[in-house]
Amino acid sequence: MTEYKRVFVDTAPLIYLLEQNLSYYDRLEKAFSSWYESGTEVITSAITVEEYCVFPYRENRMDLIENFESFLEGFGVDVFAIDEEIAKKAAWIRGQYPSLKAMDSIQVAVAEQKNCDCFLTNDKQLRQYSSLNCMIVDEMT
């Protein structure tokens, strides 16, 4: 696996990993283990927290939220808040790439502001933002 210094993780890969999705779990577990062992910094944003927690709150599954929080803490995932600078960067990104959704543009803005050298997602549409090195879960081996 390619060595990265800082990886941004989008919401879907975390859902796949934590729910042990049969199609994706093995490759994600391998990637996260490699990053952990090599000291790669893994980050995400408050958007991921919001997106992940919708289903557990809807279904009153506090165990899933506890598992999510334990994973973030145990793995040392840094969760970054959305501030005015990130909001403006996200607006600029949406202005340049109108097909990107607001949440996606915020995720991209956080990754860019935090100087991530990899963006782990399963959203191939994010590749259109060419200054971002997207790693697509479907294409991982």
Regions found by a protein language model. Name each.
Residues M1-T44, Y57-E66, S70, K124, ...:
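Short, well-structured N-terminal submotif of metal-dependent ribonuclease cores
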Residues E41, D78, N133-M135:
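Conserved beta-strand segments of alpha/beta enzyme cores
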Residues L14, V49, A87, L126-R127:
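A generic structural signal for short hydrophobic patches within well-formed alpha-helices
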Residues M1-R6, S34, V108, E112-T141:
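Acidic, PIN/NYN-like endoribonuclease modules and their adjacent C-terminal/linker elements
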Residues E37-G39, G74-F75, Q96:
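Structured helix-beta-strand junction loops
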Residues L18, P56, R94, S130:
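Short, flexible helix/strand-to-coil boundary loops that buttress conserved ligand/catalytic motifs
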Residues T2, D78-L120, K124:
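Active-site neighborhoods of divalent-metal-dependent phosphate/nucleic-acid chemistry enzymes
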